[in-house]
Amino acid sequence: MAALRRMLHLPRLTMGTCRPFAGSLADSCLADRCLWDRLHAQPRLGTVPTFDWFFGYEEVQGLLLPLLQEAQAASPLRVLDVGCGTSSLCTGLYTKSPHPVDVLGVDFSPVAVAHMNSLLEGGPGQTPLCPGHPASSLHFMHADARNLGAVASSGSFQLLLDKGTWDAVAQGGLPRAYQLLSECLRVLNPQGTLIQFSDEDPDVRLPCLEQGSRGWTVTVQELGPFRGITYFAYLIQGSH
């Protein structure tokens, strides 16, 4: 969360997008959809069509790909990215995973979803994305991660990704964050894995996750530092 706040104070976004902020977004509640609509609607001045809070796909592929390999699914492994925004996690998995994946990115900002669908299909001057495995697929849908009933049935995903979504939702109160966690665990396969990426210290995050995911195993791995900031991957796993 501290990293999100620091980046909101920057006059322009890095990693190729370089989008200047209009107004003082740093003082807004990160659980407010209007804030994210405004962010995602800003012009992209760089050549990179995605923007990542914290870090991108390249920094965590060493963690994600072994999980896909270990699953050894007979059909494409179903992956859900909650609060995907315009991140490269979904597109990176789709275009670079040597293992077949069926990736769904959901976000409560229709602006973000429209942008990612345009990127996937190949908008003006863009080439459609190509899968890293011929059996892989990628979709984006408009949905609130705290209520996934319209897009996901119980136990339907083997891997769930949450990069900063808990952090943002928790700004609206911890009950909302627990609602997010509960819904993620509902749609997660009992043998699957939920990964929360955050810069929040384990002393703060682990007690919350352990309280909200009883019956699941919660572990943490340190990531980075990336651009001088240490991050953490919080893994919530069922029986394997």
UniProtKB/Swiss-Prot annotation:
It is found in: Mitochondrion. SUPFAM superfamilies: S-adenosyl-L-methionine-dependent methyltransferases. Residues 1-21 form a transit peptide. It catalyses: L-lysyl-[citrate synthase] + S-adenosyl-L-methionine = N(6)-methyl-L-lysyl-[citrate synthase] + S-adenosyl-L-homocysteine + H(+); N(6)-methyl-L-lysyl-[citrate synthase] + S-adenosyl-L-methionine = N(6),N(6)-dimethyl-L-lysyl-[citrate synthase] + S-adenosyl-L-homocysteine + H(+); N(6),N(6)-dimethyl-L-lysyl-[citrate synthase] + S-adenosyl-L-methionine = N(6),N(6),N(6)-trimethyl-L-lysyl-[citrate synthase] + S-adenosyl-L-homocysteine + H(+). Coiled coil: none annotated. Pfam families: Methyltransf_31. One of its GO terms (biological process) is peptidyl-lysine dimethylation. The keyword Methyltransferase applies. Citrate synthase-lysine methyltransferase activity is inhibited by S-adenosylhomocysteine (AdoHcy) and oxaloacetate (OAA). Keywords: Methyltransferase, Mitochondrion, S-adenosyl-L-methionine, Transferase, Transit peptide. GO terms for cellular component: mitochondrion. The keyword RNA-binding does not apply. Its EC number is 2.1.1.-. Belongs to the methyltransferase superfamily. This is Citrate synthase-lysine N-methyltransferase CSKMT, mitochondrial.
